[in-house]
């Protein structure tokens, strides 16, 4: 099967994100080499991937047109980084979120790759200008930040280094679409990229509302899961504005003054105090106790919900 693969992709790091990338690329027909410095880590990752893909097959949620065995045959482990990158068209780094560790990995890769392979990082917050600083192949470098869990949530943020070649962005965008993901282009780097800036803005105000006793933690979550989240699963905040009036200009004419009035009441960045954290944790634990067993079960339920939502979205999305 590997001989007829769409191309060779290397995953550096065999944790949760690395395994998810491996499954996604295999679903698109790519040969996948999973690299890790620990041979046992690779063995564990391959076994976890097999179990996960079997479960996906049973649930009817396996991505791609290939069978589970065909996809599994495309994924292999490699403990030697030089051997792993041989013949690769794309390298996806997935090591822990540590700038110096990632820079060390990219420096090593930079010294052994050719001028055609794309070097991509899964970082959620490290700036490309720092991550890829000093690399010879900087024009081939890009951040491709997935959303956890990547197999069920398709968005990928593409964030270039200031010297990244436009062709690198275009190739990465096309590759993400080929494996069924939904890439978006961040035009220039900014702390937190786009997704986390929006997420942190929500968390900041949510924390403040709970801390000031305006709403309970559980009711705060209801506002998202049964309110805003229902809309945002299908349309974003800007299209919501557009549809909630006779277009965007009409919305701004009607509501901009009211929005500014409310926004002026927002306070400073919360301190995320221990006292409030304990209050929120107590409320959360009433729903999901924070022991490994209950957390794992809730994550599995979340992933099943996301799978079903993805199926629904594929059925109702406008052409």
Curated annotation (Swiss-Prot):
Keywords: Acetylation, Cytoplasm, NAD, Oxidoreductase, Phosphoprotein. Its main location: cytoplasm. It catalyses: L-gulonate + NAD(+) = 3-dehydro-L-gulonate + NADH + H(+). SUPFAM superfamilies: 6-phosphogluconate dehydrogenase C-terminal domain-like, NAD(P)-binding Rossmann-fold domains. The modification Phosphoserine is found at residues 3, 111. It is found in: Cytoplasm. One of its GO terms (biological process) is fatty acid metabolic process. InterPro entries: 3-OHacyl-CoA_DH (IPR022694), 3-OHacyl-CoA_DH_CS (IPR006180), 3-OHacyl-CoA_DH_NAD-bd (IPR006176), 3HC_DH_C (IPR006108), 6-PGluconate_DH-like_C_sf (IPR008927), 6PGD_dom2 (IPR013328), NAD(P)-bd_dom_sf (IPR036291). Inhibited by malonate. NAD(+) binds at residues 16-17, 36, 97, 102. PROSITE patterns: 3HCDH. The modification N-acetylalanine is found at residue 2. Belongs to the 3-hydroxyacyl-CoA dehydrogenase family. PANTHER family: 3-HYDROXYACYL-COA DEHYDROGENASE FAMILY PROTEIN, LAMBDA-CRYSTALLIN HOMOLOG. Homodimer. This is Lambda-crystallin homolog. The gene is CRYL1.
């Amino acid at each position: 099967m590997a001989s007829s693969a769409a191309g060779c992709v290397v995953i550096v790091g065999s944790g949760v994100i690395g395994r998810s990338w491996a499954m996604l690329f295999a679903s698109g027909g790519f040969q996948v080499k999973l690299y890790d410095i620990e041979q046992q880590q690779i063995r564990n990752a391959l076994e976890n991937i097999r179990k996960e893909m079997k479960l996906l097959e049973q649930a009817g949620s396996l991505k791609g047109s290939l069978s589970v065995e065909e996809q599994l045959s495309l994924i292999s482990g490699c403990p030697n980084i030089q051997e792993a990158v041989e013949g690769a068209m794309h390298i996806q780094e997935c090591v822990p979120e540590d700038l110096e560790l990632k820079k060390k990995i990219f420096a090593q890769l930079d010294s052994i790759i050719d001028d055609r392979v794309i070097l991509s990082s899964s970082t959620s917050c490290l700036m490309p200008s720092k991550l890829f600083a000093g690399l010879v192949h900087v024009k081939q470098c890009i951040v491709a930040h997935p959303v956890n869990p990547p197999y069920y949530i398709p968005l990928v943020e593409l964030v270039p280094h200031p010297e990244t070649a436009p062709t690198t962005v275009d190739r990465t965008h096309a590759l993400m679409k080929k494996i069924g993901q939904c890439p978006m282009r961040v035009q220039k780097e900014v702390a937190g990229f786009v997704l986390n800036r929006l997420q942190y803005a929500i968390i900041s105000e949510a924390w403040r509302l709970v801390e000031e006793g305006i709403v309970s933690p559980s009711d705060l979550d209801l506002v998202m899961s049964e309110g805003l989240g229902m809309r945002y699963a299908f349309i974003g905040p800007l299209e919501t504005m557009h549809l909630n009036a006779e277009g965007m200009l009409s919305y701004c004419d009607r509501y901009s003054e009211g929005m500014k009035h409310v926004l002026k009441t927002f306070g400073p960045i919360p301190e995320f105090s221990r006292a409030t954290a304990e209050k929120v944790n107590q409320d959360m634990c009433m729903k999901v106790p924070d022991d490994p067993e209950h957390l794992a079960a809730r994550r599995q339920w979340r992933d099943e919900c996301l799978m079903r939502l993805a199926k629904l979205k594929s059925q109702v999305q406008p052409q």
